[in-house]
A protein has these predicted regions:
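Periplasmic OmpA-like peptidoglycan-binding domain that tethers envelope proteins to the cell wall
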Residues: 1-2, 12-94
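Short, cationic low-complexity segments
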Residues: 97
Length: 97
């Protein structure tokens, strides 16, 4: 456990529109649900403090590959985990050196 690090789990989608798949109304819903599933997996399988992890959705608005090919769409359907240190502690560490 790293008490000085938080995690942001971002869900992303491709640019194909989602049309009312039950709870999933659009790519925003899909991306949030994608991130939430990863957060639940992490919380169930690791000793992570739930207060230090956040799920968010980015929809189709941050593609890794903006082309419209099948390979690009596959690449854009993803989840990213971004680790963030406490900035005040990081700043202090940098100033000590």
């Amino acid at each position: 456990t790293q008490p000085d690090i938080s995690a942001l789990v971002e869900g992303h989608t491709d640019n194909m529109k989602v049309f009312n798949l039950g709870q999933i109304k659009d790519n925003w819903d899909l991306s949030v649900m994608r991130a939430t599933q990863i957060v639940k997996l992490l919380l169930n399988s690791a000793t992570i403090d739930a207060k230090r992890i956040t799920a968010s959705g980015r929809g189709e608005f941050f593609p890794l590959d903006p082309s419209n090919s099948d390979a690009a769409k596959k690449k854009n359907r993803r989840t990213e985990i971004i680790l963030t240190p406490k900035l005040d502690e990081l700043y202090q560490m940098l100033n000590e050196k």
